């Protein structure tokens, strides 16, 4: 059975999202949700979850280059993951997101130059990278 997985790139101002199928190991960008100090419009996220009906949610875990937690943002990403699980009753996994934003910017720039580098595009592409990295980790 192939599962549908939805990923989130948590940020205090914007939360990117992506969707993917476990069978193909590929992901596509969805939507960037505006956040107010890390708090999204939960109704918008609920609408997306109802539309796509994922079996699992993956949240990018921000760390430094050595994999250590970042003092301010890492605990907030974990809290966001807990809230997703509590609100929607879906399993949630955290996944290392080191360098995902840098990689997302590079990919978007190569596809469309500076015009492609909007905050929403970068956050959604970061969610794609997080999810595809999660797929790779599952197949080890």
From Swiss-Prot:
Its EC number is 3.1.-.-. Signal peptide: none annotated. Keywords: Cytoplasm, Hydrolase, Nuclease, Ribosome biogenesis. SMART domains: YqgFc (SM00732). It is found in: Cytoplasm. The keyword Cytoplasm applies. InterPro entries: RNaseH-like_sf, YqgF, YqgF/RNaseH-like_dom, YqgF/RNaseH-like_dom_sf. One of its GO terms (molecular function) is nuclease activity. Disulfide bonds: none annotated. One of its GO terms (cellular component) is cytosol. GO terms for biological process: rRNA 5'-end processing. It is an enzyme of class 3 (hydrolase). Its main location: cytoplasm. HAMAP family: Nuclease_YqgF. Belongs to the YqgF nuclease family. PANTHER family: POLYNUCLEOTIDYL TRANSFERASE, RIBONUCLEASE H-LIKE SUPERFAMILY PROTEIN. Could be a nuclease involved in processing of the 5'-end of pre-16S rRNA. This is Putative pre-16S rRNA nuclease. It comes from Vibrio vulnificus (strain CMCP6).
């Amino acid at each position: 059975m192939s599962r549908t997985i939805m990923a989130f790139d948590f940020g205090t101002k914007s939360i990117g999202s992506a969707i993917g199928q476990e069978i193909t190991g590929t992901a596509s960008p969805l939507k960037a949700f505006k956040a107010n100090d890390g708090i999204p419009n939960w109704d918008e996220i609920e609408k997306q979850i109802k539309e796509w009906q994922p079996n699992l949610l993956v949240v990018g875990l921000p760390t430094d280059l050595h994999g250590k937690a970042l003092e301010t943002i890492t605990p907030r990403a974990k809290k966001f993951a807990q809230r997703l699980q509590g609100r929607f009753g879906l399993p949630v996994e955290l996944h290392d997101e080191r360098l995902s934003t840098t990689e997302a910017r590079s990919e978007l720039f190569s596809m469309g130059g500076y015009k492609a580098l909007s905050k929403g595009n970068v956050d959604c592409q970061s969610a794609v990278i997080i999810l595809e990295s999660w797929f790779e980790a599952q197949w080890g």
